[in-house]
Each structure stands twice: as C-alpha cells, then as structure tokens.
Amino acid sequence: MKKIVSIIALVMSIADINISNAQTTQKDQKQNPYTLVYEGAITENVKGKVNIHTVTYKIKEITIVANVYTPANYDASKKYTAVVIAHPNGGVKEQVAGLYAQRLAEQGYITITADAAYQGGSGGTPRNIDKPANRIEDILAMADFISQYQGVDSSKLGLLGICGGGGYALSAAQSDKRFKAIATVSMFNSGVVRRNGFMNSQVATIQERLEQASEARALEVSGKEIRYTANVVITDEMADKMPFDLYREGHYYYNRTHAHPNSTFKYTMSSLMDLMTFDASNNMDLINQPLLMIAGSKADSFYMTEDAFNKATNTKNKELFQIDGATHIQTYWKPEYVSQAVNKLQHFYQINL
C-alpha cells in the first residue's frame, strides 16, 4: 500500500504517465494514414469534404509539424475564420487537439494544431523540453502560419487551448491581440500543479524539487547528462486506485484508448525551473477579448478554470460553461460531451469572430 501511495504522489506531482504499455491501441494509429487516434478521424482527403493537410514551418531553427484542417468545399479564393488549437501537456496533435480541430472544421472553420517544439513530431533537442515560454511561442507561431494560409481572414482569428494548452492559451492571449476570441476546454494550470502538486498535494516538497531541477540544469550545461522526470510504468490496477479522476482516467486515455507513440509525459527535469515559477492565472486582467472557459461539472481540475475565470476582470464578455456530468478527461473523447463543447465553441466563435 505504501508503494502505491508513493506512486500516486509522484503521478499527481508530475503527471508522468508512461505510454510504454500502450501497444494494444497503437495499432489504431497505424491504420490511420495520418496516425490520428480519435473517433471519426479523417482517413483520406475527399473532394468537397473536410480535409487535413500536414505542414511544416520554423520557430527559429526548429521544425514544427502541424495539421491544418480545411472545411468542406474549401475555396482558397474565399475568406474563412481560423482557430488555433493548443494541445494538452504530453499530448500530440493526433489526439484530442485533432478531434476538436476536425470538429470545428466541420463547422466551417480553418483550424491548425501543432506539436509543441521539442515534443511529438516537431524538432528540437534535447527532446521533451517542457517550458512555458516555448509553449506560448508555439501558439504565437501557429497564429503566424495560419494567418498567411490561403483563404484565412487574419482579422478573424480564434484561439482554443485544451488542458495545459488552455493555460498557455490564456497567457498567449494576454499579449497577442490578433486573437479576437479565446476559449479553453478543461484548462490545466501547469505551473501551479508542477509547483504545488494537484490540489496542493506536494507543497512540502517544492524546495526539494527545485534543487533537483537546478542540479539537472547544471548537468545539462556541463554536457554530462540530460536528466528526465521519473518514468513510472502505471498498471491498470495502480491507476484504478488513484484518488483523482484526472490521473486515473488519463492513464486509460493516454495508455489505452487513445495512445500515440509520440505522446509522452516524460520531460527534462530542468524544465521544472521554468514550470514551477509559472502561473497561467497571472495577469488575467490583460485579457480584454471575449472569453469562454469550458469544463466538466465533475472535473476535479475545475478549480483551475474557476480561478483563472474569476481573475479575468477586464473582459466584458466572458462565460464559464459547465458540461453537466463530465470529468476532465471525458471532455477529450466522450461523444455527447465533445458535441456539447463543440456546439458551444461554434456559437462563441460565430458571434465573436
């Protein structure tokens, strides 16, 4: 029992869910030519239907890989509203971010979702650096690219962040006023959780973990070692005993039902120096754009959405929309909850873009 409790504490602190035992679902992405793992994913580009286009561009010297979704009967000579979509921590563009990108494209939008720099299919070394400044720049770079895409009306640009991508979307929108309407789904405040633990469960070890992160950076600079967060293999039995839905259901989503080989929650330990001093809810008063924050009524991560929403004091148009009965992870895949979120997003973007 003591071992199980220790593993749960580690997972709550770093959300380090290992995907090494996800072979049973990797066959699904292998069957999809775009390696998409969500239900109803595009399997081929058909004229007159929603299409997917894999694109690349640079952030400094790093190659970023993204998917652009174009709506049915896309005509490059026309003008379309575009939505930038930021994926969850450890996630990739082929999972929930791709699902929402496709569903919004079905509503007539051009959408883009990219793998974060140093992660997924994108370039950058050391692998799996996970720093807030990078994630925010990923969002700004998606806006740069999609604003120049044929058919996009750059004056009508929306932003959607999911889970950790939601926190970074809030930060990006504070300064980048190209984004005219801001939305999040199941927002996760990465810095607060990396610092304090989920629901403040790891406050006692803050200084210890900062020491470890500092030591890891010193090793990197000396060229001796790239140190990563612990790579714990979580079994189904262990997951079932976890006290929080977010981590219990997250295990099944990322390791079983929607696993992708590019998705991993392992990241460089030195990243904690940046993560633990970040708070997505800081400077929320800088957001003056319309704001929609969506979360499940049963999400144990809801406190993060509520906190950020309450701090958004300078937008005259904001709404906190709860999906009745949904948990955090269920907003990633469960058809009835995804449909509620997409319908709300479509209405929000239609009115505000």
Segments and roles (model prediction):
Residues 30-78:
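N-terminal cap/lid segment of alpha/beta-hydrolase-fold proteins
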Residues 77-88:
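Short beta-strand element of the alpha/beta-hydrolase
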Residues 90-102, 116, 305:
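The serine-hydrolase catalytic nucleophile loop
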Residues 103-123:
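Conserved alpha/beta-hydrolase
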Residues 129-150:
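Alpha/beta-hydrolase active-site loop
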Residues 170-251:
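Alpha/beta-hydrolase-fold enzymes
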Residues 287, 293-295:
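Short beta-strand/loop motif that positions the catalytic acidic residue
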Residues 326-338:
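Catalytic histidine-centered segment of alpha/beta-hydrolase-like enzymes
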